[in-house]
Amino acid sequence: MAVPSAQLRRDARVERRRLRIVEAALALFAGHGYTVTSVDDIVTRARVSKSAFYEFFESKEHCFRELLAEEGGALIHDVLTSAATGHDHHERLRLGITRFVVSCFERSDVARLLIVESVGLSDDVEALRHELQARFADAVAEEVRHAMTHDAFYEDKDPAVFGRAVVGAVSDAVGYFLTHPGVDADSLAASLCVIFAP
């Protein structure tokens, strides 16, 4: 049975309203920080009522978690998808690191949420951040695990530690150079690849 056109129009309006709220929240959380941003700031920027905000989110933190899950999840998905196209472990590691760095520079607002604003915010947000980072770290660890038997560089590396080290170093370097200009994404990615995927 077909959905009535009036219902489709209503659903489209609701989705546009949610999108305006999410876009406003992302810009404010990234630009001003989570702590300084209020629900009033978000609804003012999105040009919606407070009740519209609460139609979608229980709280400012719930909005932040949803945004981090959607946007951070999409970024990590892109990283893993790009890495999977590599022909060997070196290429997969390089592609993953490069995609993460370039994506963070292209979407610095999302990078700020994932790397800066989510740290220590709450137990739930921290758990989500760790879950997103773990997807990247686990993929790196898996590459190292397979490379240990035939690549001298990786033979003495603990895969889990190496995976976390890559995520930590790459995230920290991106966070630093997003706020201290002077290095472009490609140069930073190349330098990190020399360290972790020589």
Q: For the regions a protein language model found, what residue spans apply to each?
A:
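N-terminal intrinsically disordered/low-complexity leader segments
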Residues: 1-16
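Generic hydrophobic, amphipathic alpha-helix propensity
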Residues: 13-25, 42, 67-75, 79, ...
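Short hydrophobic clusters on alpha-helical segments that form packing/core surfaces
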Residues: 17, 21-29, 100, 170
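Helix-turn-helix
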Residues: 20, 28-62, 66
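Hydrophobic alpha-helical connector segments
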Residues: 66, 80-109, 162-166, 186-189
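Amphipathic alpha-helical packing segments from all-alpha helical-bundle domains
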Residues: 73-77, 123-150, 160-164, 171, ...
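Short secondary-structure transition hinges
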Residues: 95, 102, 106-141, 152-153, ...
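Amphipathic C-terminal alpha-helical segment
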Residues: 103-106, 110, 142, 146, ...
